[in-house]
């Protein structure tokens, strides 16, 4: 996968940097693995905005991804295609299992069409294979890591991300998260070996506001540009805030910790991401 730059023939093209999509081998998705996807516009079931700056964008269909893999333990799977997924930054790989079933997984870096992948405790340590953490050597880079055994991968699923197994002690493995946090995860949890593919995603530049709108993101309006009824920074003559910077709901911003204290999972965090 590479990046594509453009001649500045228009203002929107001048700084645009996008994927060249050379890693994509199949343009039409597998119909049996599609599901309808309704737009929410950032609203919850009460109709209230819970996530700002969402709405519009191109219509999408959801690709059903297998984040678990353990129920196919010991069954080899052949990579049929690498596909684009509009719902995530990573590419997805279409697998054909020896029992005839097709499934999508996150496409790890380095896999190609024709490769054979496996899952289960006896699988080889190579990119794309899924194993319990207890079977993966210390120092290995992994992605799609479970937090709870059997729940499916939740961590390190975005393009180019990974966790590193730092140590193992008793029933837990110590993992360095993509954020830098050191965290204990149960050794029965599954993880996929390797790094998530499409690692150049972070270097893409949209080039113009319209491309961001196609992705379903609306403008992010500054608080000082609003009226007093809309934001604590709003109103007044000129651009002054008048007080310490706050969120739209009045909480201090710029460094104020909002994480709820005394969470049950705190005992699994060995070092927070912002500690040196």
Curated annotation (Swiss-Prot):
Pfam families: Ribosomal_L2 (PF00181), Ribosomal_L2_C (PF03947). Coiled coil: none annotated. Residues 223-276 are annotated as: Disordered. GO terms for biological process: cytoplasmic translation. Gene3D superfamilies: 2.30.30.30, Nucleic acid-binding proteins, Ribosomal protein L2, domain 3. It comes from the Bacteria. InterPro entries: NA-bd_OB-fold, Rib_uL2_dom2, Ribosomal_uL2, Ribosomal_uL2_bac/org-type, Ribosomal_uL2_C, Ribosomal_uL2_CS, Ribosomal_uL2_dom3, Ribosomal_uL2_RNA-bd_dom. PROSITE patterns: RIBOSOMAL_L2. The keyword Mitochondrion does not apply. Keywords: Ribonucleoprotein, Ribosomal protein, RNA-binding, rRNA-binding. Residues 230-240, 263-276 have a biased composition (Basic and acidic residues). SUPFAM superfamilies: Nucleic acid-binding proteins (SSF50249), Translation proteins SH3-like domain (SSF50104). GO terms for cellular component: large ribosomal subunit. Signal peptide: none annotated. GO terms for molecular function: rRNA binding; structural constituent of ribosome; transferase activity. Belongs to the universal ribosomal protein uL2 family. PANTHER family: LARGE RIBOSOMAL SUBUNIT PROTEIN UL2M (PTHR13691:SF5), RIBOSOMAL PROTEIN L2 (PTHR13691). Part of the 50S ribosomal subunit. Forms a bridge to the 30S subunit in the 70S ribosome. One of the primary rRNA binding proteins. Required for association of the 30S and 50S subunits to form the 70S ribosome, for tRNA binding and peptide bond formation. It has been suggested to have peptidyltransferase activity; this is somewhat controversial. Makes several contacts with the 16S rRNA in the 70S ribosome. This is Large ribosomal subunit protein uL2. It comes from Thermotoga neapolitana (strain ATCC 49049 / DSM 4359 / NBRC 107923 / NS-E). The gene is rplB.
